[in-house]
Amino acid sequence: LALVDPNFFSIFTLPLIEGDVKTALIQPHTIVITKATAKKYFGGEDAMGKTLAFDHNMASYKVTGVIDDIPSNSHFHFDMFASMTGWEPAKSDSWMGGNFYTYLLLKPGTDYAKMEARFPAMVEKYMGPQIQKEMGLSLSQFRTKGNSLGFALQPLTSIHLHSATNNEFEPGG
């Protein structure tokens, strides 16, 4: 299960077999599932409009879309994509949580190095004050203690075979 932004399917080309890519995840407690998941939970019945309930105090989710199963050469293999709209942790303006993966669509010809060169200033501006507030340390003190913070860009096409970053969904290669 992946909690995703309503724009997820406008970034990733996972066409919906059923449902509308533009509206499937706009409402809270909506979910798009794979064909295999639809068959697993609903047999031969149409999954659209049905409800999936989860443990661990998560709400029930209404099926608003069905996609083909994720290809084997993808860097993620989730079988359910639930809307994070209305999900309380997603409303936080804290930059301290590392629990989100962010994908960017860049214009053709974008200079990756120039864009990455702006990231340290973002860390200083947005994370520095939060580290000070939450930990009582300046950003430099935080780093002196062996911690690191930063962002890097990686082309989506290189993740499956070549990624060696920490906390990937699956090992590269």
Task: Please give the residue ranges for each predicted region.
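Mid-to-C-terminal secondary-structure elements
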Residues: A2-E18, H29-G172
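Glycine-rich loop motifs involved in handling phospho/adenylate chemistry
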Residues: K22-I26
